[in-house]
């Protein structure tokens, strides 16, 4: 009996690996995500991503109260153009709502507004979500499951481990103009089956300077990733590596881990 238990403990990580991973996670795998739909994501970010041939996911919302100000935020035609450029458009709620304070009906309304807007513009069905302000709770995960979302991104300033992190609690680092050393150090953690995900706001961010990433710093990150031969993808492309249904089945959501930035 003791020998069987020892054998099971030795084999369990291999079994888990085989069930959750469709393909091995390569070292130097990075996901770039962009929140809140500031105007600079269209004018600065998208052209630079194209220049470097990098993927990315844009989590869009209508950030109240100034979302209609084209000097601050993208309009829906620009968001449509991001999709046409080959980038993923994903859901960040209608009004940048704290989903931990919403009923299921309220949450569904927030999600459906963005879904319907995208559908009207020919943008493919949205499958991924990011928690505005990193506000979340266990109910939010249940609501996302009911709506058939695949991945949901939080914060936490740590690498994503598909063998231990629930697909609705994917951690990320957030960039700003002060944490260059932290972000460069974070890239080093993209190894041994772990994936580094960045949350980026405006480049620059005029309305929310505390999450501002200067364009020259953003380009420096892209250059670092290119020179050091990182693979840079969207959230959606994680499905090439991860069996999400198995990950949901095998991982209980762990709210004791850090989930905000």
Feature locations, PLM:
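Short, solvent-exposed loop/turn segments at secondary-structure junctions
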Residues: 37-39, 63-65, 94-96, 134-136, ...
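Structural recognition of the beta-strand scaffold that forms the well-ordered cores
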Residues: 29-33, 56-60, 88-93, 125-131, ...
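Charged helix-capping and loop-helix junction motifs
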Residues: 71-77, 106-110, 211-217
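Bacterial Sec-dependent N-terminal signal peptides
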Residues: 1-22
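C-terminal domain-boundary segment and adjacent tail
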Residues: 20-21, 66, 119, 151-160, ...
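Acidic/histidine-rich helix-loop elements
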Residues: 60-73, 98-104, 207-210
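Catalytic domains of cell-wall/extracellular-matrix polysaccharide-remodeling enzymes
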Residues: 41-44, 49, 70, 98-185, ...
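Active-site beta->alpha N-cap acidic-glycine motif
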Residues: 20-88, 115-117, 124-131, 224, ...
